[in-house]
Amino acid sequence: MSRSTYSLEQLADFLKVEFQGNGATLLSGVEEIEEAKTAHITFLDNEKYAKHLKSSEAGAIIISRTQFQKYRDLNKNFLITSESPSLVFQKCLELFITPVDSGFPGIHPTAVIHPTAIIEDHVCIEPYAVVCQHAHVGSACHIGSGSVIGAYSTVGQHSYIHPRVVIRERVSIGKRVIIQPGAVIGSCGFGYVTSAFGQHKHLKHLGKVIIEDDVEIGANTTIDRGRFKHSVVREGSKIDNLVQIAHQVEVGQHSMIVAQAGIAGSTKIGNHVIIGGQAGITGHICIADHVIMMAQTGVTKSITSPGIYGGAPARPYQEIHRQVAKVRNLPRLEERIAALEKLVQKLEALSEQH
């Protein structure tokens, strides 16, 4: 049996979960539930895909305890978890999937590193990357091809900076941070003052950008530095592709921002906030902890209570739901009003006759 082949029983032991079925079943790969074959392990998380359970050829299926009670009679090999099946499946990837390496170990000779920069042990710096003066790259970091680490910036241990990322001067990147290609961290904010002659003069931005530990930043996302105060993304937050975070914004711990969202300057986002795709948030407001914004939400004032919000301007989801229901009934209301108008006209005609 190869290192990448495991029995169902071995996998259950590794994942610390229970199993039902033939413990000797051999598994050597992972696949989504519709495509999985007898040597594959898969998972069911979203009930929309439960329709594929009966026909699935997967050698083993990771499901929750609640799902197991519903589907235990299907005579399948099940791994039963109290956690999210998707999270447990992710652990399987550590066994079956070998990460793709760039093929450039160590520091490539074309990398440009300033003599005052500090590079700790076990760092990989790929071709044509630039590390500027007094920058500090922590141990076991990976700096991708063409990326720039600006002057006086720091990159914490075990962080992975993908190709063509720009980290400007005086930026602080925490430990285990992942930044995808094309992201720009620390550009000057969009701050201007208009002169008496109508000319827009750019203001100097002296603040820093601070990215705390375990943050992930998507491709082509931009996080601007503040004019005086710092722009901050707190521990564990995840930011999707094409997100704009303006100057002096603070994003709380373990929040999630989906693609094409934009946050204007000096706004403070709480902890465990979810911001849907293409949402827009105005500047100088606060968003409470545990707020969820639906896609394309337009936020024009502070949100002080947890809950689900949507629409433009943003309002509680229940209110939107009621409004949508009323709009759906408008055709019937129109018919009733037309009927009432006809009735009134008849009554008026009768009144005139008498």
Curated annotation (Swiss-Prot):
Its EC number is 2.3.1.191. It comes from the Bacteria. The keyword Transmembrane does not apply. GO terms for biological process: lipid A biosynthetic process. Keywords: Acyltransferase, Lipid A biosynthesis, Lipid biosynthesis, Lipid metabolism, Repeat, Transferase. The keyword Nucleus does not apply. One of its GO terms (cellular component) is membrane. NCBIfam families: lipid_A_lpxD (TIGR01853), PRK00892.1 (NF002060). This is UDP-3-O-acylglucosamine N-acyltransferase. It comes from Chlamydia trachomatis serovar L2b (strain UCH-1/proctitis). The lineage of its organism: Bacteria, Pseudomonadati, Chlamydiota, Chlamydiia, Chlamydiales.
